Amino acid sequence: MKNRWSDIEARRWIQRGRLAGLSEDVSLRIYTTRILGEDPQLVLHGGGNTSVKTILPDTLGQLTEVICVKGSGWDMSRIEAAGLPALRLEPLRELRAVQEMDDVRMMKYLRGALLDPAAVNPSVETLLHAFLPHKFIDHTHANAVLAIANQPEAEKICRKIYGDRLGFVPYVMPGYPLAHVAMRHFGSRPEVEGMILLHHGIFTWGDSAREAYDRMIRYVGMAEAFLRSRRKRSFSVTPKTGEASLEKVAPVLRGALASWSADGKRQRWVLDHRTSPGIREFLSSKNLKRLTGPSVVTPEQVIRNKPFPLLTSVPSADLSLWAKRLRTELDAFQKRYGA
């Protein structure tokens, strides 16, 4: 796990922010949010979120304690100030005493705390960020952490790796319930530098943007090192000869995927073929069905990744037979997907 912090870049972001009327806190929050979001080992498909607690003027010009948190729909790798809506912090902290609230009421409450009523919706995990006392908080769905946090004995493994430096929280649906569970766990161990949320991801925090970011990179790196130490062997790639070429397979696949719209028009798809040594190595595994069967590594990725893929094979000769089998496989996939 490479630490991409640069003092030079940090100063540049501060200077840009000053010209745009942004505080140093917000400028550095933008900078580290972006370098987190640009690393696919940490964040995929717009997942994760970040926050900073700071002081900003409200509509009347009065200095107000706020939390700027990633807004829904914003990609961390392209975040701008508008993607970090500011909310009054004190009204959010008052919710620590309210044990239950559904998502609709919670979002209405959060919108009522926005400094700018026209701002985007704040993250569903805003209250988790608000309930914790730390100035800068980072949250990612790091691949290496999830590879461990999804194991049957995940907490035991995590304690072996991290000792007492991190807290460990069982999976809870993001939103109001998770915010309260995380708050209670932190309250029992306020010395920790972050949290592993089982089947979900990792939080780190700090008094500065760099401290929170450094901790994220360090703890994800420790997970990577642990996995490397346990790796027995790579998947073996089985060379195959005589398969139908991509040029012959693609039209058959497009035909099978085509469908009729409600207004009677034919809907066809443009295919995007992707391959690499890593992809071919993975697809050559004898355990491919098992490896692709358990769904995404965290429920937070299901919106973009979807729960499972359709696996099919290409025959070496008769594509007409494969086309019939593909149609059967697609029908079964659609029924499973819609169940």
Predicted features, each with a name:
Residues 1-339:
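Glycine-rich flexible loops
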